[in-house]
Regions:
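Active-site anion-handling motifs in enzyme catalytic cores
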Residues: 1-410
Length: 410
């Protein structure tokens, strides 16, 4: 006996939904992992039965960090392998590295171009949707990543499935043929969401463009809830440092550049504020890389506490303690300011980080953004975001997540 309703449900269940996510996860980097975790947790609530594919450049480490966040998540690097291969200028043959996105779009959506990755291509071709998670990884800093976006657009174009991009930071904007490839691809997306005004202006006229801020807002409430408990009598002079060593070549202060300049600036700031070493906490946003400046500071940090990335990831970012932050990294600024902490945002690379940090002050962060590293900023006491500003940012991102992935039980 055939029961039409049951038969329809059985047929629907037999065609399992595949949600295909693309993200720079697994390096690891606090912000990138926070964003991936936030979306996986949302999907665990909204689409618990779906197969979720996270295509990222370091799937092994990403799997170790994120495999518990959704019951059916799998990790691969299909598109990231293709993007890296096509952009490689050391090859004597193969795709044209000056237009790598052309080959990647073809290889990702048709069999034969990348036979070793056929299993991954098969999964990508069967995806029910494709989604570039937020971050600042498709821009002039990493131009070859435009291939990821073009591949997603090609899937949408050839199969009709929706393509989404959320919380994108496109500044510094790609130029020339790379810029054209990006805007042409963006036009194929059902939703193309950006995190800052400059990125929105760069896509002026592209249908489907919206602006709801950084994707980390989707996970801020969890990040604040996971923060280590505050001591009953925290230090009133505490300072937390999160200082990168990558992308610092353009930083200039006191007649020096790069890491030397950043080290001198931080030392001078700590001295001006009269912060003793034992009042300082050092945070790793990227493991290893964020210990370079603290190591250079040497005895100036005598007695300081260091929180390695592993502890940050498993035990939470130590925010809400009343410390004043000095951070070059963007997502520690976002989370600490969301907790109400005061801070100074230092811009290590102006064409990239200025837009990022100022996207937060534009929506209410009261942090000081350093414009002139030769001038030591006064220690701020104004706090970060107000509760209403934080809640507004969280609500906007949650609303977008609900629109893209409404709750479904089958």
């Amino acid at each position: 006996v055939q029961i039409p309703g049951v038969d329809r449900l059985r047929k629907r269940l037999s065609k399992r939904e595949i949600i295909y996510l693309i993200a720079p996860s697994g390096h690891p980097n606090y912000g990138d992992e926070l964003i991936a975790r936030a979306w996986l947790r949302h999907l665990a609530r909204a689409r618990p039965r779906a197969m979720v594919v996270l295509d990222c450049h370091s799937p092994g480490q990403a799997a170790l960090m994120l495999h518990t966040e959704h019951p059916n998540v799998v990790f691969t690097d299909t598109l990231w392998q293709m993007a890296g291969y096509a952009a490689n200028t050391d090859r004597a043959d193969g795709p044209d590295p000056t237009t790598p996105w052309i080959w990647v779009a073809q290889a990702a959506t048709t069999f034969g171009k990348a036979p070793r990755l056929a299993e991954g291509v098969d999964v990508f071709r069967r995806a029910s949707s494709v989604h570039l998670l937020g971050g600042g990884y498709v821009n002039q800093v990493w131009p070859h990543h435009v291939s990821l976006m073009v591949a997603a657009a090609q899937l949408a174009r050839t199969t009709g499935v929706p393509a989404y991009a959320t919380g994108q930071g496109l500044i510094p904007m790609l130029t020339g043929s790379y810029g054209s490839a990006l805007t042409d691809a963006a036009a194929e997306f059902t939703v193309f969401d950006v995190r800052d005004d400059a990125s929105s202006k760069a896509l002026a006229g592209v249908a489907g463009t919206r602006q709801t801020g950084d994707d980390a807002w989707l996970g801020v409430e969890d990040a604040l809830a996971a923060a280590p408990a505050v001591d009953s009598s925290p230090r009133r002079d505490g300072v937390t440092l999160c200082l990168q060593s990558d992308l610092t070549d353009d930083f200039t202060a006191f007649g020096t550049t790069g890491l030397d300049a950043l080290t001198r600036f931080v030392r001078a700031t700590l001295d001006e504020w009269q912060v003793p070493g034992e009042a300082i906490t050092v945070i790793e946003g990227i493991p290893g890389a964020d210990n370079e400046i603290p190591t250079r500071l040497g005895d100036r940090l005598a007695g300081a506490r260091t929180v390695p990335f592993l502890d940050v990831w498993h035990s939470g970012l130590p925010v809400g303690r009343g410390d004043t932050w000095i951070s070059t990294r963007f997502h520690p600024h976002l989370v600490a300011a969301a907790a109400g902490d005061s801070g100074v945002a230092v811009i290590p690379r102006p064409d990239y980080y200025a837009t990022k940090h100022r996207s937060l002050t534009a929506i209410g962060s009261l942090w000081t953004v350093v414009d002139d590293p030769d001038t030591i900023p006064a220690r701020p006491h104004a706090g970060g975001f107000s509760a209403s500003e934080r809640d507004r940012a969280v609500a906007a991102k949650k609303e977008l997540a609900q629109q893209i992935y409404p709750r479904r039980w089958f």
